[in-house]
C-alpha cells in the first residue's frame, strides 16, 4: 500500500510524481461520490475543518466547504472582516487562538507568500494552502491536472500553454511545478512585463506570441489579468492586451483541434478570453470547478485519515 508521507499541503514543490498520482487517483474516487444522489460520507465524521480566508474568495472557499461537508466533517468558515485580525491581531496570534480550539485541519488563504507555511509551524493540526500571495495554489494545480488527465488520459508528454499574467499568478507557479513533475511540456505565453525574472529556469519554454505559443498545444490555460496586484502599468491598455494576448476562436486555431481550454477563474471576458471560447465545445472550465471539490475531498481525506496509516514526515512541501 502506498502512503502519503506529508502532514500539510503547502505547495506542489516537494511533492513527488508518486504523491501527485496518489492524490489524483484518490480524487477520481471522490468524483464518483460527488456524482451520486447521496453525496455525504462519514469519512471525517467527528473531525473539524476551519476555513480561514484573508482574501475574498467565492469558488475556492465554497469548494473547500463542500468538500469537508461531503466527507462528514464539521466545517467552520472564519470571516476575517469580523475577526480580531481587523483589530490588530497578528497571524501568529490568530493561529494560536485557533489551535487552542483543537481543529483537525486549517485551510488558509492569505495575501502574503509564506503565510501557510508560517501557520503550519505554529499549529498542531494539518494545514492546507488555499493560496498565499504570488507563491502557490496547490489544490488549483491538482484540480487542473485531474481535469486534463480525465480528458486526455495522461499528463506526460502533452503540451500545455499557460497564457497571460504569469508574473502575479500563484496558479501558474503551482501548475508549472506539477506539470513538470508529471512529464508534460510547459510553455508560458505573455508579454515580457508579465513574466517573472528567471522563468525559463523553471523548465518552461517562453513565448511572446499567442500563435507561436499555442502551436500544436494540447491544453491552453488562460490566466486572469490581476490588476489588483499591479502597482504600475504592466500593459498599455486592456484593449491592447486583449488584441495581442486574448484568446478568441481564431487564435485558438493555432492549438490542436482537440485542445482543451482552461481558466482558473474568475474570468474577465473580453480581457483574456472571449465568450465564444469560454463557452465553446473545447472549454472544460465547468469541469475544473467540479474537479475542485473532488481534489479537495481527496486532500482532506489523505491528510486526516491516510496519514495515520503509515510513516509520515512533517515536511511542509513549501
Curated annotation (Swiss-Prot):
Single GO cellular component term: cytosol
GO MF assignments: amino acid binding; aspartate carbamoyltransferase activity
Enzyme Commission number(s) of this protein: 2.1.3.2
Pathway(s) it belongs to: Pyrimidine metabolism; UMP biosynthesis via de novo pathway; (S)-dihydroorotate from bicarbonate: step 2/3
Residues engaged in binding L-aspartate: 87, 170, 224
Superkingdom in the source lineage: Bacteria
Family annotation (InterPro entries): Asp/Orn_carbamoyltranf_P-bd, Asp/Orn_carbamoylTrfase, Asp/Orn_carbamoylTrfase_sf, Asp_carbamoyltransf, Asp_carbamoyltransf_Asp/Orn-bd
Record has Translocase as a keyword: no
Residues binding carbamoyl phosphate, per UniProt: 59-60, 109, 137, 140, 265-266
Function: Catalyzes the condensation of carbamoyl phosphate and aspartate to form carbamoyl aspartate and inorganic phosphate, the committed step in the de novo pyrimidine nucleotide biosynthesis pathway.
Protein family: Belongs to the aspartate/ornithine carbamoyltransferase superfamily. ATCase family.
Listed name of the protein: Aspartate carbamoyltransferase catalytic subunit
Organism, as annotated: Rhizobium johnstonii (strain DSM 114642 / LMG 32736 / 3841) (Rhizobium leguminosarum bv. viciae)
Source organism phylogeny: Bacteria, Pseudomonadati, Pseudomonadota, Alphaproteobacteria, Hyphomicrobiales
Gene: pyrB
Amino acid at each position: 500500500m502506498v502512503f502519503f508521507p506529508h502532514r500539510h499541503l503547502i505547495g506542489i514543490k516537494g511533492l513527488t510524481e508518486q504523491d501527485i498520482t496518489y492524490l489524483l487517483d484518490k480524487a477520481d474516487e471522490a468524483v464518483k461520490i460527488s456524482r451520486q444522489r447521496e453525496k455525504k460520507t462519514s469519512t471525517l465524521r467527528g473531525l473539524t475543518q476551519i476555513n480561514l480566508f484573508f482574501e475574498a474568495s467565492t469558488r475556492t472557499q465554497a469548494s473547500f466547504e463542500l468538500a469537508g461537508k461531503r466527507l462528514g466533517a464539521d466545517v467552520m468558515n472564519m470571516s476575517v472582516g469580523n475577526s480580531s485580525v481587523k483589530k490588530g491581531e497578528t497571524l501568529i496570534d490568530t493561529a494560536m487562538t485557533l489551535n487552542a480550539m483543537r481543529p483537525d485541519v486549517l485551510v488558509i488563504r492569505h495575501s502574503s507568500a509564506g503565510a501557510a507555511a508560517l501557520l503550519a509551524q505554529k499549529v498542531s493540526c494539518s494545514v492546507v494552502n488555499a493560496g498565499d500571495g504570488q507563491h502557490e495554489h496547490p489544490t488549483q494545480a491538482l484540480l487542473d491536472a485531474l481535469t486534463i488527465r480525465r480528458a486526455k488520459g495522461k499528463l506526460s508528454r502533452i503540451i500545455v500553454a499557460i497564457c497571460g499574467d504569469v508574473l502575479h499568478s500563484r496558479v501558474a507557479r503551482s501548475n508549472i511545478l506539477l506539470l513538470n513533475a508529471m512529464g508534460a511540456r510547459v510553455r508560458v505565453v505573455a508579454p515580457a512585463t508579465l513574466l517573472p525574472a528567471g522563468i525559463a529556469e523553471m523548465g518552461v519554454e517562453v513565448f511572446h506570441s499567442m500563435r507561436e505559443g499555442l502551436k500544436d498545444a494540447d491544453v491552453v490555460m488562460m490566466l486572469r489579468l490581476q490588476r489588483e496586484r499591479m502597482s504600475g502599468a504592466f500593459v498599455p491598455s486592456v484593449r491592447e492586451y486583449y488584441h495581442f494576448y486574448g484568446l478568441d476562436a481564431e487564435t485558438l486555431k493555432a492549438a490542436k483541434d482537440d485542445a482543451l481550454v482552461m481558466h482558473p477563474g474568475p474570468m474577465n471576458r473580453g480581457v483574456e478570453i472571449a465568450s465564444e471560447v469560454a463557452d465553446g465545445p473545447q472549454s472544460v472550465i465547468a469541469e475544473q470547478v467540479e474537479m475542485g471539490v473532488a481534489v479537495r475531498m481527496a486532500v482532506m481525506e489523505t491528510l486526516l485519515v491516510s496519514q495515520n496509516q503509515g510513516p509520515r514526515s512533517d515536511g511542509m512541501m513549501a
